[in-house]
Amino acid sequence: CQRYDDGHYAAWRHLADEAPDLVVFLRDYSYESAPRKDRVRTHSGTGAAKTLDDYRARYAQYKSDADLQRIHASAPWILTWDDHEVKNDYAGDRGQDLAPDFLARRTAAYRAWWEHMPMPPSTRPVGPDLRVHDRYDWGTLARFHVLDDRQHRDAHACPPAGRGGSTTVNVADCPDLLRADRTILGSAQERWLEEGLAQRDVRWNLIAQQTLMAPFTWTKEGRYWTDGWAGYPAARDRLFDAIVARKVANPVVLSGDVHCNYVCDIKRR
């Protein structure tokens, strides 16, 4: 994540100094939020980004930063998106505020993202949809399976009353959380991922995606956060079952989202 009004991009400056071979960016290239006077820097516009012109202006502002320009010039990028490129905590065609015109907003946001990111022309948006998931090989050393767990996911389980989006829940209070048919990737992307992981021609399989895949609880009593994979446990189980069944070589999950660093072994449950 690189929220412009949180601070300056010193990290990009230092990374560019190290001359990386590749940059892998996993979510929230830009933020849709309205400008605030109490921030380090101020977002463009007079309100949250909602229209195509709004989103284009937001990317123009982010890309005016000299350090961000430099890191783009330093190395090729592999990247995916998450929610803030559109609207916080959206799920598929459903916005957090349940606004009836959300799909039009998503369409505008997707178009602006595609226009400003190093994506091939073949991925041009089709209506409100844009294919982001893809595979990239680094010789025979590693394969990046880049996922999109935002566009095709089911709605969050047990959202707060009167709105969409995530929360923390106890499993006992939210039977919907454990439904076997719930998906965070969509069935087509799940099949695509399993088929790619089954190939045995690289040493490392790097699953690059937006949100925490490791189980994440907020309390000792087991309150689960529903925006990450903990909110879609059946989908995570299917992926882990496939990794075991296919005997996938050296799987490693790379995750974005939480503005912290974790290194851990991911358990099935």
Roles of regions detected by a PLM:
Residues 1-269:
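Metal-dependent phosphoester/phosphodiester hydrolase catalytic core
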